[in-house]
Amino acid sequence: MKTLSAKPAEVTHDWYVVDADGKTLGRLATQIATRLRGKHKTCFTPHVDTGDFIVVINAEKIAVTGKKAQDKKYYRHSGYPGGIKETNFTKLIAHKPEDVLHKAVKGMLPKGPLGYAMIKKLKLYAGTEHPHEAQQPKELDI
């Protein structure tokens, strides 16, 4: 019996919608990263993008445990000397709720061209509405 190596043209990418309301940040991010990589499929091949499209709704209602809401820090840099900015979870979720989950999932994906292609298949929305009804996404219970 030979090992199956998936070809990019043979892979089908399904669409799933995930409701993040009340879910824990890290636990949800690991499940999403696994689906984006395609590790749940039998045809998983490390050098081929075999993952699915994931649409996340209610990103503003994601939860963290303990004191992470005040203690967890997020950094960004402008590119100029001394241009580092710092914010915490509470401020970031109020200003850009999609960025919290995006940063968590992006850190769990491989770095390089394949990882960049995988993160593009993640669609994040703060509310319940999303413009991907035409793709008929299936409900994914995580």
UniProtKB/Swiss-Prot annotation:
CDD domains reported for this sequence: Ribosomal_L13 (cd00392)
Q: Which GO terms describe its biological process?
A: negative regulation of translation; translation
Q: How does it assemble?
A: Part of the 50S ribosomal subunit.
- An example molecular function term from Gene Ontology annotations: structural constituent of ribosome
InterPro entries assigned: Ribosomal_uL13, Ribosomal_uL13_bac-type, Ribosomal_uL13_sf
One GO location term (cellular component): cytosolic large ribosomal subunit
Q: What UniProt keywords apply to this chain's record, in alphabetical order?
A: Ribonucleoprotein, Ribosomal protein
Name the family the entry cites.
Belongs to the universal ribosomal protein uL13 family.
General function of this protein: This protein is one of the early assembly proteins of the 50S ribosomal subunit, although it is not seen to bind rRNA by itself. It is important during the early stages of 50S assembly.
Matching entries from Gene3D superfamilies are given as: Ribosomal protein L13
Indicate what this protein is called per its UniProt record.
Large ribosomal subunit protein uL13
